[in-house]
């Protein structure tokens, strides 16, 4: 009987102090969640600023790369259509209307210039 009374008294004390600690635990949980949200917010802000910096660097690199990779326009070879809507003929060729292609496709072609 004495042991039951001791265990019941321990149960009552544990329940009483357990409730008190529960309030403290709730306060601690609130503080932890607030700190976590604060840290997450700061981490998000840092990540966003990092993304903005990377985008600025990427823009600068692409501007330099676009200027560096620009090539001269390609030229058309022999027996290729030329004119206003096409690329110019390569050196050594001239854009002329010929009997073989011009009358059928109605456009001049790049050919070796005639001497006559």
Curated annotation (Swiss-Prot):
Q: Which residues form the propeptide?
A: 21-74
Report the transmembrane regions from the record. Answer: none
Q: Which Pfam families match?
A: Toxin_22
Q: Where in the cell is it found?
A: Secreted
A Gene Ontology cellular-component term? extracellular region
For this chain, one GO molecular function annotation is: toxin activity
Tissue specificity remark: Expressed by the venom gland.
Predominant localisation class: secreted
- Alphabetically list the UniProt keywords: Cleavage on pair of basic residues, Disulfide bond, Ion channel impairing toxin, Knottin, Secreted, Signal, Toxin
Position of the signal peptide: 1-20
Q: What does this protein do?
A: Ion channel inhibitor.
The name this protein carries in UniProt is: U16-barytoxin-Tl1a
**The organism's taxonomic lineage, starting at the top:** Eukaryota, Metazoa, Ecdysozoa, Arthropoda, Chelicerata
